[in-house]
From Swiss-Prot:
Domain of life: Bacteria
GO-annotated biological processes: DNA-templated transcription
Annotated protein name in UniProt: DNA-directed RNA polymerase subunit omega
Record keyword RNA-binding present: no
Organism of derivation: Rhizorhabdus wittichii (strain DSM 6014 / CCUG 31198 / JCM 15750 / NBRC 105917 / EY 4224 / RW1) (Sphingomonas wittichii)
Keywords: DNA-directed RNA polymerase, Nucleotidyltransferase, Transcription, Transferase
Subunit structure: The RNAP catalytic core consists of 2 alpha, 1 beta, 1 beta' and 1 omega subunit. When a sigma factor is associated with the core the holoenzyme is formed, which can initiate transcription.
Primary gene name: rpoZ
């Protein structure tokens, strides 16, 4: 296959910056052992990723979700239930009590005679 350029892929993913992020994500997936959707033809992983995008063997939506999930620092679990109002009020009260300033020492200046 001829050299793959950004122009071959830009009609699939219009934003060049998104294209770079998604191609890099796909190249990392390939490096991690993901199955190729096209023949490698002695190309390196970034070129294979661009060829897959150009030939539409991977969808931009899948790549976008993969990019977003890798950039998230905190992953939301389905098991996590939202806190109840009572526990929120108790948490706020506990925070108020722990954040209160300690009582000031009334003996200013030390123990001098």
């Amino acid at each position: 296959m001829a050299r793959v350029t950004v122009e071959d892929c830009v009609d699939k993913i219009s934003n060049r910056f998104d294209l770079v992020l998604m191609a890099a994500q796909r190249a990392r997936q390939i490096s991690g052992g993901a199955e190729l959707t096209i023949d490698r033809d002695r190309d390196k992983n970034p070129v294979v990723a661009l060829r897959e995008i150009a030939e539409q063997t991977v969808t931009p939506e899948e790549l976008h979700e993969a990019v977003v999930s890798t950039l998230q620092r905190v992953r939301v679990d389905d098991d996590d239930a939202p806190d109840e109002i009572g526990s929120l009020a108790a948490s706020a009260e506990a925070l108020r009590l722990t954040a209160a300033a300690p009582p000031r020492n009334q003996n200013i200046g030390g123990d001098y005679e």
